[in-house]
């Protein structure tokens, strides 16, 4: 069996969030339909710390992207969704329910959801996130 990538394991974890209406999360792809979700890796220096024994503390940063309906009233709902998602991630850390990445330390949101782009009827919101894990030498 082929081992899953770390970003795929992150996607699997996010798909367990009860706030997602259709439950399906893509990687580096978001549909133009509302209630579409994607995990989009962002380029960062992966090594946070190198240890004397050769082990390392590493990070993956990514955006959780949400395609949502866009209007004055919908924007209030979308803002609440982003806040609720942030709280869900926080609660998962508290109970140690994390992505199934070996050596994982945490997953967290680095900010609230903000609008990346809009059309007349939809908006893409992004929530910047980080996973930190340790790798032995």
Feature roles, as predicted:
Residues 34-38:
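Extended compositionally biased segments used for macromolecular assembly or nucleic-acid engagement
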Residues 1-25, 29-31, 43-137:
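Charged, amphipathic alpha-helical segments and their flanking helix caps
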